[in-house]
Amino acid sequence: MLYDIARPFLFSLDAETAHEFTLAALNLAGRTLPAGKPEAADAVRVMGIDFPNRIGLAAGLDKNGEAIDGLARLGFGFIEIGTITPRPQPGNPRPRLFRLPEVRGIINRMGFNNHGVDTLVANVKAARFKGVLGINIGKNFDTPIENAADDYLACLDKVYPLASYVTVNISSPNTKNLRQLQGESELDDLLGRLKSAQQRLADQHGRYVPLTLKIAPDLEAAQITNIADALRRHRIDAVIATNTTISRDKVQGVRFAEQQGGLSGAPVFEASTAVVAQLATALGGELPIIAAGGVMDTRSARAKLEAGASLVQLYSGLIYRGPCLVRECVRATADFPR
């Protein structure tokens, strides 16, 4: 109800200013109001973690972990922050975030703008939140793609003690050549190095933190099969499907559709859900799938689970529907078979 009142004001601002205003409000709420708790549902065990409900926040809304306690008040079963890089970087020039309200879509070309992993670590340590926290890691824009693994490993070392799980983002379309890491040989090398580091860190900290891989929706069937094989071979703990799409098939003629960047929201739902279904077949239940992409209502949340996902993440849907979407989706997925 409150969001219905606030939305016209937020939509009167340019998209990134509205994003910044929302983060500031969540930050204030987190610092001044009692700690939040997840919307009630039967817990589900995924990656060895007990998630209080199946609905989580996708990475991208809170890149630096500034508003974790405020976000915790919205009822999520888990929160994913980032994408974070080893060094601070400004991202791409503004404007770089565009709403497509006619189709409930968003285009972004943010470019991993963030304050660097050390700032995120400090913010996580300062937060009161004790729930399931994912931390999404990436590479700096000026790190050569052949050295990308070094950036992921640097971030993993620093966030490992604080994360419930760590997501390796190789699928943003807004960092030059990043999606090359989804190639067969590149992915094999990256996952091998990450798995070795995970095992070393587990011994060092006496605690196993799962690794997930976030992939794109713009993949051929053979690529999905290759990725599934690599995930199994390197014993990665889960996969997130999917990131944003570079396709504009669903938004032809819509204002801002020509803007460069990744498209999210309702227009990516079908492609993203198809990847979930293909992954589910290719993986044969050997590791869980976390679905993201176009979850705008309870029907689309359940469709992700029916396609083979174990957990569901929201982001664009929050912008168009507000916090009520979290509660609705938790309730709609609470009775889904475990």
From Swiss-Prot:
State what this protein does.
Catalyzes the conversion of dihydroorotate to orotate with quinone as electron acceptor.
GO MF, any single term: dihydroorotate dehydrogenase (quinone) activity
Which top EC class applies here? oxidoreductase
Entry's NCBIfam families? Answer: PRK05286.1-1, PRK05286.1-2, PRK05286.1-4, PRK05286.2-5, pyrD_sub2
Q: What is this protein called?
A: Dihydroorotate dehydrogenase (quinone)
Q: Which GO terms describe its biological process?
A: 'de novo' pyrimidine nucleobase biosynthetic process; 'de novo' UMP biosynthetic process
Which residues carry out catalysis? 172
Per UniProt, subcellular location reads as: Cell membrane
The pathway noted for it is:
Pyrimidine metabolism; UMP biosynthesis via de novo pathway; orotate from (S)-dihydroorotate (quinone route): step 1/1
Q: How does it sit in the membrane?
A: Peripheral membrane protein
Keywords, alphabetical? Cell membrane, Flavoprotein, FMN, Membrane, Oxidoreductase, Pyrimidine biosynthesis
Q: Return the Gene3D superfamilies for the record.
A: Aldolase class I (3.20.20.70)
Keyword Flavoprotein recorded: yes
Q: What is its EC number?
A: 1.3.5.2
User: Which cofactor(s) are needed, names only?
Assistant: FMN
As recorded in Swiss-Prot or TrEMBL, the protein's gene is named: pyrD
The cofactor note from the UniProt entry for this protein is:
Binds 1 FMN per subunit.
* Oligomeric and partner information: Monomer.
Q: Which InterPro entries match?
A: Aldolase_TIM (IPR013785), DHO_dehydrogenase (IPR050074), Dihydroorotate_DH_1_2 (IPR012135), Dihydroorotate_DH_2 (IPR005719), Dihydroorotate_DH_cat (IPR005720), Dihydroorotate_DH_CS (IPR001295)
Catalysed reaction(s) here are: (S)-dihydroorotate + a quinone = orotate + a quinol
